[in-house]
Amino acid sequence: MTEESLIEYPCDFPIKIMGKSQQGFTQSVLSIVKTYAPDFDDTTLEVRSSRNGAYLSLTCTIQATSRTQLDSLYQALHDHPMVTMLL
């Protein structure tokens, strides 16, 4: 049985990464994202702080080229200790 993708590659694909607001969080996330999406432009990074400033939400819109790329990127982000949640 083959797994059919609902996504047509290449495409712009937003990834939302959340974690506690701490030194090095943004840089760590960007480093991981650039490992799997080397063309990601830092200037397009969207950063939002929670109401009380305890958490950060980063949205990285990458140029996704394959399901394998997305799966690997999500796994690397999920495994990082500073990342609390991914969407």
From Swiss-Prot:
InterPro entries for this protein: UPF0250_YbeD-like, YbeD-like_sf
Disulfide bridge map: none
Gene3D superfamilies named in the record: 3.30.70.260
Extent of the signal sequence: none
Stretches assigned to coiled coil: none
GO cellular component terms listed in the entry, alphabetical order: cytosol
Pfam families: DUF493
Origin: domain of life: Bacteria
TM region(s), chain numbering: none
Record family assignment: Belongs to the UPF0250 family.
Protein name: UPF0250 protein NE1487
Organism: Nitrosomonas europaea (strain ATCC 19718 / CIP 103999 / KCTC 2705 / NBRC 14298)
